[in-house]
């Protein structure tokens, strides 16, 4: 079983789904980026579009659920209540003061992917070890929504407007990070070119 847990596991699930979606949508060379250099630059995957290689930061967000009974089940760690917010990391590590991924990313685009998974963390981790036909048949993504955000305009907007939003501590992958929780209407009014792709899981499962 994969050793990833928590936000790292959710991130790996999101990257796997998005790569499959891009490949099915006419970008056959879409692939996850796993080397250390891309990791340091917050680049999670890449694909070719209009003759150019596009690099992507993926942000997975489990706050997409709407079923109260599933939200109440604490063992369903990846089924949190939908909020209509963006979570943007302003500080990656309280101790080292490393800037968050918004500032550090060298990607061209942010793929902000909300997904609610109606399974336990252990069930999700076990499925990550399975081949694609099993993974995509059995992973219980109940709701999902993809937004594609141009990274440079986002970084410029966040540098100017980020302080308007109260910071919130988040424990992620053993680090104490800080996030700004931004209403989606604010971000999408301030950053030109946001694409509301919508649900993609149905396309990769078909």
Which residues make up each language-model segment?
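Nucleic-acid endonuclease domains
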Residues: 1-55, 59-206
């Amino acid at each position: 079983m994969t050793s990833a847990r928590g936000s790292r596991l959710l991130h790996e699930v999101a990257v796997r789904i998005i790569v499959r979606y891009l490949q099915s949508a006419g970008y056959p060379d879409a692939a996850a980026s796993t080397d250390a250099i891309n990791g340091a630059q917050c680049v999670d995957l890449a694909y070719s579009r209009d003759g150019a290689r596009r690099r992507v930061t993926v942000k997975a967000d489990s706050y997409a659920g709407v079923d109260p009974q599933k939200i109440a089940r604490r063992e369903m760690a990846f089924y949190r209540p939908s909020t209509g917010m963006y979570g943007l990391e302003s500080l990656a590590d309280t101790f080292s003061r490393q800037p968050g991924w918004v500032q550090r990313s060298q990607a061209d685009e942010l793929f902000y992917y909300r997904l609610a998974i109606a399974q336990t963390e252990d069930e999700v981790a076990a499925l990550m070890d399975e081949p694609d036909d099993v993974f995509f048949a059995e992973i219980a993504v109940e709701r999902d929504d993809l937004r594609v955000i141009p990274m440079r305009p986002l970084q410029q907007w966040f540098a100017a407007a980020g302080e308007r939003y109260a910071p919130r501590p988040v424990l992620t992958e053993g680090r104490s990070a800080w996030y700004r929780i931004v209403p989606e209407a604010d971000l999408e009014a301030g950053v030109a070119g946001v694409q509301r792709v919508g649900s993609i899981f149905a396309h990769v499962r078909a």
